[in-house]
Amino acid sequence: MTETPLNLAYSPSYFARDYEATLRRQAALGIDLVARHQPITLRYGKDPAARLNLFVPESTAGPWPLMLFIHGGYWQALDNTATDFLAERYLARGMAFTSLGYGLAPETSINTMVNQCLEGIAAACNALADNGGVWSIVLGGHSAGAQLAYWVAASDDIPIDKLILVSGVYDLTPLVDTYVNEALELTPTQALALSPIFADSSKLPPCQVVIAENDPPTFRQQAHDFVAALKTSHIQVELVDIANCDHFDVLDAL
């Protein structure tokens, strides 16, 4: 990444304490959990990255509330296992948990990523139907995953009961002139069309928008602007600002 002012403004790692250590720690926690609590692993579609891990509570019988989570990585990095570590806290609450994966840029477009996430959610729900069932669905996403989660919920194809968007990107238009777009290759028109803040949000479920104290200021401002837009659309929305966290370790506080 060339350290231009605009690139730095949209670089979460620039504002983070030690993002590489955080990602390593979270990955290790996920590996440890998988060793202790074997998930159901499913693939959907032809893309090798379109896969999920479904963790089912062992202490309670279904049907269960289901938490689905879409990882970040600016649409071009990481995979579903990056969020496996989150499953432990939801299992402790008696919830099933799914880490969703999707194909990455430049091979996969953002619209295709959304469709893959929809396929993954359907696969998870079908798998749970054979193992006790689902009685409510919460969908979460982090960073780029928050943008994908928004479009999944806005599609109205899956009955989402609550949306949790963490340190998300809600206006993609500034990214067109940044390093992020080297893989995405978005035109200004495409970036506008993919931006949740400019979309019709009237059918969204209740929404929680989470930001970290040490998120990039651009991300924090986007979150505030997005919440204001949702309120204008009469969506039930809560802004949660988590202190002493950055863009990466904010997931530890969920």
Question: Which residues fall in each region the model found?
Answer:
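Alpha/beta-hydrolase
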Residues: 70, 166, 242-245
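Primarily recognizes the serine-hydrolase "nucleophile elbow" in alpha/beta-hydrolase
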Residues: 119-183
